[in-house]
Amino acid sequence: MAKKSLIEKENSKKKLVKKYNLLRQFLRREIKNSLRIQDKLIISEKLQSLPRNSARVRLRNRCSLTGRPRSNYRDFGFSRHVLREMAHTCVLPGVLKSSW
């Protein structure tokens, strides 16, 4: 189980990413479409003035139950430990244990 403070920090980052996502996309598009270098510099300064944690790169995928940061399956949102336990208890529909 991950520390609650780390899980809360990740949740606050998600909120910031959601809040500034459209503005970041707009500024990136403006940089790409502008022709003058001075305009690009001004727009890039505006982009740099946004909070660091509002960048999607700074997010970390975590297990939705335990908060484990590593070995997560995107399709389910769980870590490998939780996914295995849920598959064995038949909680996840359509997930079967492989055998050959």
From Swiss-Prot:
Instruction: Tell me one GO biological process term.
Output: translation
| GO terms of molecular function | rRNA binding; structural constituent of ribosome
Q: Write out the entry's keywords from A to Z.
A: Chloroplast, Plastid, Ribonucleoprotein, Ribosomal protein, RNA-binding, rRNA-binding
CC annotations in GO: chloroplast; small ribosomal subunit
The record ties this protein, via InterPro entries, to: Ribosomal_uS14, Ribosomal_uS14_bac/plastid, Ribosomal_uS14_CS
Per UniProt, subcellular location reads as: Plastid, Chloroplast
Q: Does the keyword Cytoplasm apply?
A: no
Pfam families, per database record: Ribosomal_S14
Family to which this protein belongs: Belongs to the universal ribosomal protein uS14 family.
The record's subunit annotation is:
Part of the 30S ribosomal subunit.
Say what the protein does.
Binds 16S rRNA, required for the assembly of 30S particles.
What this protein is called in its record is: Small ribosomal subunit protein uS14c
What organism does the record attribute this protein to?
A: Adiantum capillus-veneris
Q: What is the lineage of its organism?
A: Eukaryota, Viridiplantae, Streptophyta, Embryophyta, Tracheophyta
